[in-house]
Amino acid sequence: MSEQTQTCASEIQATNVAVQHPKSEKINLMNLTRQEMRELFAEMGEKPFRADQLMKWIYHFGEDNFDNMSNINKVLREKLKQIAEIKAPEVSVEQRSSDGTIKWAMQVGDQQIETVYIPEDDRATLCVSSQVGCALACKFCSTAQQGFNRNLTVSEIIGQVWRASKIIGNFGVTGVRPITNVVMMGMGEPLLNLNNVIPAMEIMLDDFAYGLSKRRVTLSTAGVVPALDIMREKIDVALAISLHAPNDELRDEIMPINKKYNIKMLMDSVHKYLEVSNANHGKVTIEYVLLDHVNDGTEHAHQLAEVLKNTPCKINLIPWNPFPEAPYGKSSNSRVDRFQKTLMEYGFTVIVRKTRGDDIDAACGQLAGDVIDRTKRTMEKRKFGKGIAVQNH
């Protein structure tokens, strides 16, 4: 094992503080991939195809009551009720933006995470969290200011998709656009929770569950290089890189992880990923949040073009979304336009991401949730006070 991989393993272990459950507790079937569920049924002396049936009930029909699973015999249903449960995070608060975006505070133990549904004309994207809080301390991100609490379990990750699907109507004809895309861009750094994120994404891709195509599941990372190297051997999904700076000096300042894995190391790892991935037509999405007079100058655009000159990519420019006590300002439209045009002159595809849900703090970089605040800041500044408590579906 390489020194970098060993370092990554220790980092993942350091953040692996998910809630420990007593052995006597029931098995949450949402923690299992289909293969793991088939193994469970084999241990029970049942045919493995029962796992396929159960997966369909849970994820195709949104069913969490064994009694309603009509093609599973009563004896097996009773056996399942004794040892297993189907349990997703519940919604404690819901907020709806004027642009159709919905943000949910979902309860995970005694804490909350945030999940965002973003409908568009041709798709509907669900932004999913992977951790309670975040350990990476990026200076422009609200989540990072709260510190890190713990990793989410598989059921807490895939359960966000399940719960959102129940609410917006994936399991029935409601006139609301169903979820077509899932992005691991919510709270947390997904590559520091690989042991739970990869199985959750496997369920998203599984035809017996959500059956999403590889290009419709996107993992976004700030650049935990050894973990990205591990992931490329495990699963193929679309990749997005939170770059946000065109040189190491600036990236060190705004994204401390760069001091450990610099831009060259990160881009080398990205190229290796693209060599084996066909999830997004051999391209990576580069995310770049624009901070006024920090990283949005013409010289920064030229530097970014140099960094990306040999990388098949699409560039998403993200207008920065303010949060309390943040040390930055939002770039003017003229600076955004100039930055975009400079990159386009090099031949890059450059999109300025439309800000969605900023009136409910659901926009990029604004998610914080009700976590145990390691920085001792109160969460009363959040806008969830304007939300409504909801009955769980």
From Swiss-Prot:
**Its EC number(s):** 2.1.1.192
Q: Which residues cross the membrane?
A: none
Q: One GO molecular function term?
A: metal ion binding
Q: What catalytic activity does the UniProt entry give for this protein?
A: adenosine(2503) in 23S rRNA + 2 reduced [2Fe-2S]-[ferredoxin] + 2 S-adenosyl-L-methionine = 2-methyladenosine(2503) in 23S rRNA + 5'-deoxyadenosine + L-methionine + 2 oxidized [2Fe-2S]-[ferredoxin] + S-adenosyl-L-homocysteine; adenosine(37) in tRNA + 2 reduced [2Fe-2S]-[ferredoxin] + 2 S-adenosyl-L-methionine = 2-methyladenosine(37) in tRNA + 5'-deoxyadenosine + L-methionine + 2 oxidized [2Fe-2S]-[ferredoxin] + S-adenosyl-L-homocysteine
For this UniProt record, give its keywords in alphabetical order, as a comma-separated list. Answer: 4Fe-4S, Cytoplasm, Disulfide bond, Iron, Iron-sulfur, Metal-binding, Methyltransferase, rRNA processing, S-adenosyl-L-methionine, Transferase, tRNA processing
Keyword Ribosomal protein part of the UniProt annotation: no
Cofactor(s) this protein requires? [4Fe-4S] cluster
UniProt-annotated location(s) = Cytoplasm
A GO CC term attached to the entry: cytoplasm
Q: Which residues form the Radical SAM core domain?
A: 120-359
Q: Say yes or no: keyword Methyltransferase present.
A: yes
Q: What class does this enzyme belong to in the EC scheme?
A: transferase
Active-site residues from the entry: E114 (proton acceptor), C364 (s-methylcysteine intermediate)
Which residues does the record give as S-adenosyl-L-methionine binding sites?
G188, E189, S220, S242, L243, H244, N321
Q: Which GO terms describe its biological process?
A: rRNA base methylation; tRNA methylation
Q: Pfam families under this entry?
A: Radical_SAM (PF04055), RlmN_N (PF21016)
Q: What is its main location?
A: cytoplasm
Further information in the entry reads: Reaction proceeds by a ping-pong mechanism involving intermediate methylation of a conserved cysteine residue.
The protein's role, per its UniProt record? Specifically methylates position 2 of adenine 2503 in 23S rRNA and position 2 of adenine 37 in tRNAs. m2A2503 modification seems to play a crucial role in the proofreading step occurring at the peptidyl transferase center and thus would serve to optimize ribosomal fidelity.
- UniProt family annotation: Belongs to the radical SAM superfamily. RlmN family.
Q: Identify this protein by name.
A: Dual-specificity RNA methyltransferase RlmN
